[in-house]
Amino acid sequence: MKPTGTDPRILSIAAEVAKSPEQNVPVILLKLKEIINITPLGSSELKKIKQDIYCYDLIQYCLLVLSQDYSRIQGGWTTISQLTQILSHCCVGLEPGEDAEEFYNELLPSAAENFLVLGRQLQTCFINAAKAEEKDELLHFFQIVTDSLFWLLGGHVELIQNVLQSDHFLHLLQADNVQIGSAVMMMLQNILQINSGDLLRIGRKALYSILDEVIFKLFSTPSPVIRSTATKLLLLMAESHQEILILLRQSTCYKGLRRLLSKQETGTEFSQELRQLVGLLSPMVYQEVEEQKLHQAACLIQAYWKGFQTRKRLKKLPSAVIALQRSFRSKRSKMLLEINRQKEEEDLKLQLQLQRQRAMRLSRELQLSMLEIVHPGQVEKHYREMEEKSALIIQKHWRGYRERKNFHQQRQSLIEYKAAVTLQRAALKFLAKCRKKKKLFAPWRGLQELTDARRVELKKRVDDYVRRHLGSPMSDVVSRELHAQAQERLQHYFMGRALEERAQQHREALIAQISTNVEQLMKAPSLKEAEGKEPELFLSRSRPVAAKAKQAHLTTLKHIQAPWWKKLGEESGDEIDVPKDELSIELENLFIGGTKPP
């Protein structure tokens, strides 16, 4: 039922939330913060505003927004942190009225759990952040979320037990970062100062986990802030609850705790709390009755445990025996099946051998009966013919085997020879290129220095040559024409050399292609071993070659299919004309690699 006299600002916000799309809802809900901040704290007007917010399901909208992924919310962590403040302030001091059961049993635990989940997400983002400014901003948002959770727990103490038992809270407490860890431990200290009685109402496992984490941070963290907070937490737990103090004294899990605390530095800021904690954990005179009780309790637990294990083992004995019998029978049946199969195979082999012997005996009897019909003078001739036929068959098989063996050996050696030639050709070509590069890029070494005697001798030879071959004087115009002719011939030479190099490269490419084709033909399988795709490897990649091959194939077919009287007078070198229509049949179906479709 909607309350009367609702604040018009709440009505307008609720109407905007109902009409706006989902992505705009978080920004609209932030308007509630302005309304709450300008209203005096503790006034009846603020209480009425909180009731209106709850009645129009704006708190539920805040919960739904906080349960979404932070990356999808407009404004990111800034919007989320402000929504946590709005949610905590609205839930504290609210009188739900008729929906009190739903509010206390569902909404408040869900809000506390959402705050813890947001804390874990902020912790993960803080750890993954690389920049210091981003870390400071995330730490500020984390502090806002923890403050909102503490504000909510301060107004609803019954939620402390749920928070302490939550796995998310334990994960936050196990943070290795100094800032996150100190913030969580300060929140735990403030929670225990509000109501430490809930610490004994939580499960044994959760209590041990909290104690283990606090003690671990006390001894393993070098940060004095975390160590001071951990010491204060342990002191607060031990002073508030005698059960926890007894647990820290007598439990085997915390054996040697006092000795480790005594070794801590005494000049620190928390040395006073440390001394108080050591004093609480100092050994006292334990009564023999308590030790005897503990011993009897341990013996009783062991007896019950051993009895339970024995009864459990006895219950499993029949099933174990049944399983053993089943496995034994299955193995025995498999063994019998194997023995029967072996016997059947042996019987089959024996029957085949007997049939073979029987057939051989019948064939020999038939031969003897046929020999009885033959004239006695022809028997020796028959035996001689049989021996010759047998010898010929043996020789034929032996020669075939020898030729096949020699062929395979020669084929392998020929392949190796071709490979060696190819490698040598490639190596020689590579060395020639290297020598050519060295000649092109070789530095100028200058001329060898001449001796005085050699210089005089050369000068004398030049003077003699000039004296014997007096040249006619050449004009400047003739000299220039001669120079132009020389340049033209030099240019013609260089252009011809480029064409010769291209022709040489083309010849080398053709030789390499021919070598590849020869090697491919040598490696070609026999007709019996050939598969469907292997003949496609021998199709030419050149259209003229493919057309010429098609023409030769059709010529051969026409020559074979022609009647005998048409072949009279033909010579082996004569060519047969093939129509172009027949030549173009299926030519487009040939695989021509390296070409583009028209």
Curated annotation (Swiss-Prot):
Tissue distribution: Ubiquitously expressed in fetal and adult tissues. Localized to the outer segments and connecting cilia of photoreceptor cells. Up-regulated in a number of primary colorectal and gastric tumors.
Classification via Pfam families: IQ
PTM-bearing positions, type Phosphoserine: S572
UniProt region (Interaction with BBS1, BBS2, BBS4, BBS7, BBS8 and BBS9), positions on chain: 530-598
Function text: Involved in ciliogenesis. The function in an early step in cilia formation depends on its association with CEP290/NPHP6. Involved in regulation of the BBSome complex integrity, specifically for presence of BBS2 and BBS5 in the complex, and in ciliary targeting of selected BBSome cargos. May play a role in controlling entry of the BBSome complex to cilia possibly implicating CEP290/NPHP6.
Disease linkage: Senior-Loken syndrome 5: A renal-retinal disorder characterized by progressive wasting of the filtering unit of the kidney (nephronophthisis), with or without medullary cystic renal disease, and progressive eye disease. Typically this disorder becomes apparent during the first year of life. Leber congenital amaurosis 10: A severe dystrophy of the retina, typically becoming evident in the first years of life. Visual function is usually poor and often accompanied by nystagmus, sluggish or near-absent pupillary responses, photophobia, high hyperopia and keratoconus.
Name listed for the protein in its UniProt record: IQ calmodulin-binding motif-containing protein 1
Organism field: Homo sapiens
